[in-house]
């Protein structure tokens, strides 16, 4: 399957994406990760107001194949979580780069985004 990643997205090695949205950062998991998981049946996300730290687990995704932890690509405080994905995990399955986003955070250090892979580098990584 050929994957397409938006140019403004930045990616962690663990397949989470992040991108700046004004002064905030939107976080989700890549289309590649969703494809690898298969049918997603449950998503667990922390409450709004929770602090997350880069590289630490912030929730999990359960599919018919496995339960996988998700890791914060940047540090910050959760200002919004996508409750639609919690109620209907298929939104993550159907549109991981759009309506299936997971969290919006207020980043502690927006420069952490530059430490992540750009779309081209990520595409090469998953193709190797």
Curated annotation (Swiss-Prot):
Residues 24-106 form the Lipoyl-binding domain. Its cofactor is (R)-lipoate. SUPFAM superfamilies: Single hybrid motif. It holds the Pfam family GCV_H. Binds 1 lipoyl cofactor covalently. Gene3D superfamilies: 2.40.50.100. GO terms for biological process: glycine decarboxylation via glycine cleavage system. It comes from the Bacteria. CDD domains: GCS_H. The modification N6-lipoyllysine is found at residue 65. Keywords: Lipoyl. GO terms for cellular component: cytosol; glycine cleavage complex. The glycine cleavage system is composed of four proteins: P, T, L and H. Belongs to the GcvH family. The glycine cleavage system catalyzes the degradation of glycine. The H protein shuttles the methylamine group of glycine from the P protein to the T protein. This is Glycine cleavage system H protein. The gene is gcvH.
């Amino acid at each position: 399957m050929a994957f397409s990643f938006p140019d403004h997205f930045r990616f962690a090695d663990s397949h989470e994406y992040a991108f700046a949205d004004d002064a905030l950062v939107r976080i989700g998991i890549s289309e590649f990760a969703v494809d690898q998981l298969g049918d997603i049946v449950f998503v667990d996300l922390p409450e709004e107001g929770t602090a997350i730290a880069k590289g630490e687990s912030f929730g999990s995704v359960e599919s018919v194949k496995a339960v996988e932890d998700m890791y914060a690509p940047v540090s910050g405080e959760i200002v919004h979580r996508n409750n639609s994905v919690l109620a209907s995990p298929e939104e993550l399955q159907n549109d991981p780069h759009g309506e299936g986003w997971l969290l919006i955070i207020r980043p502690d250090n927006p420069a952490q985004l530059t430490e992540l892979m750009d779309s081209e580098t990520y595409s090469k990584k998953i193709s190797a």
